[in-house]
Structure formats: C-alpha cells, structure tokens
Amino acid sequence: MVSLEKNDHLMLARQLPLKSVALILAGGRGTRLKDLTNKRAKPAVHFGGKFRIIDFALSNCINSGIRRMGVITQYQSHTLVQHIQRGWSFFNEEMNEFVDLLPAQQRMKGENWYRGTADAVTQNLDIIRRYKAEYVVILAGDHIYKQDYSHMLIDHVEKGARCTVACMPVPIEEASAFGVMAVDENDKIIEFVEKPANPPSMPNDPSKSLASMGIYVFDADYLYELLEEDDRDENSSHDFGKDLIPKITEAGLAYAHPFPLSCVQSDPDAEPYWRDVGTLEAYWKANLDLASVVPELDMYDRNWPIRTYNESLPPAKFVQDRSGSHGMTLNSLVSGGCVISGSVVVQSVLFSRVRVNSFCNIDSAVLLPEVWVGRSCRLRRCVIDRACVIPEGMVIGENAEEDARRFYRSEEGIVLVTREMLRKLGHKQER
C-alpha cells in the first residue's frame, strides 16, 4: 500500500490515463432487449434522445484523460462501427490518440466468435501489445454511468494491486446477475463468485451484496500473462468473471474499488448512478427518468459532457393542425428534426426526426429515430423501434391482450413495437 500526497494525486490523475489503454467490450447481443437488438449490438442501441449506449463508456474515457481506446466488436456490428466512424473520428493519431475497432480475429481454428470476455481480449493481444500501455482498463460497452477512470487508476497504483475491480452494493435479490465479492478492511478481494445462486450479503448490510460492475484495471504485463495462461487452459470458459478474477483473487492480487469514489455527479449527496439497461423495462424506465423534473442522471453537466454523432438537423417544431389544436409537450425530451402537429406528448422521449401527426396522445413512450405516427393514435408505456410507421388510429398500451397478440409485451406491461411486427399485421412501413 502506497501513501500519496495531494500533489501526487494531481500528477497521477494526469499521467496515469496517458499510460493507459481502454478496451471496451462491445460485442454483446443483449437478448433480454428482445427484438430491439435483432439488427444491432446492445452497445449500439439508442439512448437518451440522441445517444447510443456505448457513448457513455467512450465519453468517460475522454473525460478521464484516456485517449487510446479499442472497441471489441462481434454481434451485428455494422451499426456500431458506422456510429463510431461518424461520431468518434476526431482523434489525432499524431498525438497518439485513437479509437481502434477490433473485430473477432478468428485466430482459433474452427472458432468464428469470441469464446468469452477474456478471449475477446486474447484474440486481439498482438494488436493491444503494440499500444505499449502500462495499464489496461477493461470496460463493458453496454452500461449507463459517468465515472472518472483516473481516480480508479490512482486507487490501483496506491494499493499496489495487479488487478482492480470496480464494485457497488446491489439488492441481494438482484445479485445473482453479477459477480459477487467479499473484501477485507483494505479492500483486498478475499472471495469472488460469478453469478451465484445464493449470493452472500455484505457484513454491514444483510439486504445488499457487493457486486462487480465489470470494470477492471490491470497492470498490462500481468494481464497479458494471465490471458496467455487462460488461452492454454482447455477447461476455462475464457471469461473475466468466471475464470480470471477468481484466479487473481486466489493469488491475493485483486482489489476492489468502490464506485462512489470515482462516480461523477453534480449532486454529491445523490446516489451513485449506474444502470444495466439490459431488459426492456430497465431500458424504458432509464430513458423516461431523463425526462423527469430532476433526473437521476445529469446529462447537462458541462464539465462531463457525453459526446455522440451529431447529425445536422433543424430544431424540434411544435405546430397547430388545421383545426387549431396546438402541438404541446410536458416533461419530455424532444430531439432535433421532430415535428409535433396538434398532439400532446407527456413524459416521453422522442429521438431525432420523429413525426407525430394530429390528434395523437403520447404518454410514457420512447420513440426511436424516424418514427412516424399517424393521426389519432394513442401510445402509452411503449418503445417504438426506429423508422416504424404507426398507422392512423392505432392504440398501443391500453389493452394487454391486444398488445400481446400484436407485439411484444413484457411482464411489466411495456410494449415493444418493430417494423417487422407491423408488417406482419399488414401495415406498410414505407412512407
């Protein structure tokens, strides 16, 4: 354990990110989002009115001072690759800044896909080694949060760790979806179990478990050595949570980093914000929260901007229809290029180029880009996928049986509508 003075912290906050490379695991399918990920990887799913989910991990890197990034892709990667090429191509390679796209290399005979999260890094080791980084930050590309990775890097160095795992308490009934750990008084991880059926509780709070967030910092040389050993192990599933972290824990070289120490928040008294929007309800709820009066996630912090591809679009427009009814919204996010004509939009999120025609009522809905809503529609508690054409007079979210017959309806009553579902009902999707 190394004790650092305040000036040392400031120096390390500048230096450590420059000595690091971030690898963002962005190949996940996200099957729990159902048809929303049929044609795009989960990190490429739209979020918050104008962003993609991966923009949060990428923006965290830039804001933390990390300007060398590799995005590891796999499932349905075209949309993700296109987004990064369009929105994240401003780096200066002469200044050693870049975002590298790293698809599956098929280096294992007979293997076309990554065998696990660790194998996704292993297959790109020859490229990653060329970065000559001292530290490697491993990130998931499908979570919504704001974090200063420089604080986690300082914690890693100060504790003398070879591997540091970001963690946060979660309700014990939800902990089976995470890696769960126990730590000593110095935050050394003394036990780690991946997705246990009966998760252990925290000693000071029986209602919570200490969960891994899938965010890791490694000494680079140590990581490369581990990955090569794991690659030779025929009994390994080649996964960080299932194989590598338990092995490092057993060797006594893994430390925990409490997320509140590096979470970026405008309100220091607020609960640290981190969301896995992996289910339809979680995705819908996280989007709608941004439209609330005081959202849990501050998207207006000029000191920690979330960057994305910005298409040149006109401002949103609210107009009256021919009968004189005004287009109006309340507690909603409405992006550029939208036109609301003589309709009411309440507690909803409308992405770019959405058109809502006259006499509609939109309530608690998420409408992805280029959705076209015909006249006299009522949409409630739903997610409408990109470029859907909702026919005149359609009602969604008011009749559970009808919704389940026509579309996908979750157990919580959130309805997902896609172009393919509408086509099967005989509704043309071309305008």
Swiss-Prot record:
Activation and inhibition: Allosterically activated by fructose-1,6-bisphosphate (F16BP) and inhibited by AMP.
Superkingdom of origin: Bacteria
Pfam families cross-referenced by the UniProt entry: Hexapep_GlmU, NTP_transferase
GO BP annotations, alphabetical order: glycogen biosynthetic process
Keywords linked to the UniProt accession: Allosteric enzyme, ATP-binding, Carbohydrate metabolism, Glycogen biosynthesis, Glycogen metabolism, Nucleotide-binding, Nucleotidyltransferase, Transferase
Pathway: Glycan biosynthesis; glycogen biosynthesis
Function: Involved in the biosynthesis of ADP-glucose, a building block required for the elongation reactions to produce glycogen. Catalyzes the reaction between ATP and alpha-D-glucose 1-phosphate (G1P) to produce pyrophosphate and ADP-Glc.
Subunit structure: Homotetramer.
Name of the featured protein: Glucose-1-phosphate adenylyltransferase
Gene that this polypeptide is encoded by: glgC
